[in-house]
Amino acid sequence: MNANRVRTAFFAAAALCLAAAPLAAADLKTVGSGDAMNFDPSGFREEMKSKFEIMRSKCVKCHTMERTIVAIKTGVAPISGQPFDRGATKAYGIKMLRKPDSDMNKDQVKAVVELMNYLLDEAAR
Amino acid sequence: MGVSARRSRVHRFTCAGAAFAVGTLLLATFCATPAEAIPAFSRELKTECTTCHTIFPQLNEFGQAFEKNGFVWPGGVAKSKKVKVTQTEEERKSAEFINLSGIPNTLPLSASLGLTYRYDEDKEDNFDQKFYSAELFGAGTFGGDKIGFWFNESLGGQSGGPTGPSQVWFVANHPFGVPVHLKAGRLSPDLSLWKTTLNGRMLSMGANINSFLVTSAQSGVEISSFLGSRAIAVFGVNDRNNAVGKDADGKDLAVRSVNDFYGRVGVKFGGTDFHGKEPDVDLDKDSVWDYLSISLNAFGYSGSQSGPDHVNRDVTRFGAEAEVAYKKLLLMFGATRGENDTSKAAVEITALSAEVDYVFNPMFAVALRYDHLDVDGKDPRAVVTPGVIYAPFQSVKFRLSAAIDSNPTLAATGKADKTTTAQLSATLSF
């Protein structure tokens, strides 16, 4: 009897994990290709959606979103070849904050850095 | 010159200036398209010009770090990694022979074409002064960033065209593991915070002193090293071929090779360091150092130069420079003190310069500059230079500027002691 319960619980947990796995991967879906490539924010956590709006409007001013997507998905910054991790997201955030033409304030940079960290976590899942 | 004639010229100048400004603005309106980067480094590293420049050729903080590291991307990541990420597997395999050969991925050549229209209020044919220039340059790295190289050579043009001194040099990056950059070839001494000393232009105006310029290219060897991440020291020796005089028959004696010595020490507070690392900004707290950087530099040069009588005489220069950058504002200050030995007595020279730049965006900037040259304390010359720069693309630049030059020494020759010139120049690099 106990063995049956354990077996049932095990299969239930396994089924739950299998069901959840594709959902997690789906969080980092992208749409479009090349210059028009962008994240699909439909699977983002609610508080990240507003941060994505900042990223969508500010980051593409100087470069394509593809550059960011490649960095987050591969963990390597595409131009420099340097690791793109949590340390790098803050460094890039500061670089953009100090770039005269970025027109980003600290709150906006902080929001984008938090979003990139969230996306890195999602990509690693 | 009569008052009415002067007024007429002023009026014509004003109209011409307005026409240039309107023309430039019209170009601005019709040429505005998405920025495209093209020259050699941009192609090789697959990144846009503004990674290293504000408006070319002026380097931003990252560009300065890139240059000082021998054209190696700060952070020291091997090139092969970059290739793996940016290319498909098939492309990577086809590029492997390039990596194994240790050569740049793209042909590291660029060219720059320039065209300048100049207005001179004192010339009879005010506007009929056109200058063109074409310059070829190349730069890159070999052997997985071990050796950097640079060359630039004028392909032709007219005197007055905007080309720099011809240079060909190599730089060994950290040779034998020693943390220095060793540069050799025909090079322009690295004495300045910027590509050339701020006083260079003013000192070149002192042609009545002699043609000596510390930044002119010479064969030499230069070694530079970072002291920590925010200080740099440079020392160099160059080899000038100077005549040493005439014999009893008035013939030139054999040209003698003479060594000059120079060096500089620079330090930077705030901003990106010499390794390209961003400052540690607290995103929850504001500080003036979030955007402020201050760079200081001191240099010295001791050498010799042959004058019109073909005799070698000592030349010394000492200078100090400062740069303050805050957001879109850039302030630059430079002072050079020098002494030239002559056949009579030593001539003392003092040049002071200040410039303020405001970069509205990567396409549009304004600049105002003041230069002062004093030779033996007599009749100092002053030049005020306002300018507007418009770059519709990252590789195309228009510059409209004027120079109001007060030169009292000209009064003795019967010429006007105050002259105004204006110029519109276009530069295209690819």
Predicted regions and their residues:
Chain A
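Electrostatic cytochrome c docking/interface patches
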Residues: 25-55
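Bacterial N-terminal signal peptides that target proteins for export
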Residues: 2-12
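Long, compositionally biased, intrinsically disordered segments
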Residues: 31, 86, 122-125
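C-terminal segment of classical bacterial N-terminal signal peptides
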Residues: 16-24
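Extracytoplasmic/secreted proteins, especially bacterial periplasmic and envelope-associated proteins
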Residues: 50, 54, 88-91, 107, ...
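The canonical Cys-X-X-Cys-His
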Residues: 56-66, 112-116
